[in-house]
């Protein structure tokens, strides 16, 4: 079982749709975590997105970072954090299964493609209430368990 998703009871209703995504915890030189908000949405989340059919998580993440932030990161710069599941922030009756990576952000970035806003999060401060469930309930606790990122 993946972190975050309850086991299904034998006679329970069918499970909701699950999207396969890849996302990155990108840290600036001050140790702050980069968050993004897509157009016409409320919740902040990690940069990344849906995997295309047949696409591995790392390739999907590199493609999404280029599209969303015009950021090119080599595969070796992205370290795996883990695989997590949570309710999707912006799609009803949907879960996300996410491969999460972390890396240092090599330079400043600007929102592109469908991104509306960027925000920096100091992970030592209280968690804001406008974070996606995956980030709030799964990724932030996992980051706190790392020796250092």
Q: How would you label these PLM feature ranges?
A:
Residues 72-82:
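A short coil-to-beta-strand element that immediately follows conserved catalytic motifs
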Residues 32-68, 72:
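Conserved Nudix-box catalytic region and its N-terminal flanking loop in Nudix hydrolases
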Residues 84-110:
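Active-site-adjacent beta-strand/loop module that shapes the phosphate/pyrophosphate-binding cleft
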Residues 1-14:
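N-terminal amphipathic/basic-hydrophobic helices that include classical n-h-c signal peptides
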Residues 26-27, 35, 102-103, 120:
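Conserved hydrophobic "DFG−1" position in protein kinase catalytic cores
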Residues 100-102, 110-147:
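NUDIX/MutT-family hydrolases
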Residues 11-33, 50:
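Conserved N-terminal beta-strand and adjoining loop/helix that marks the start
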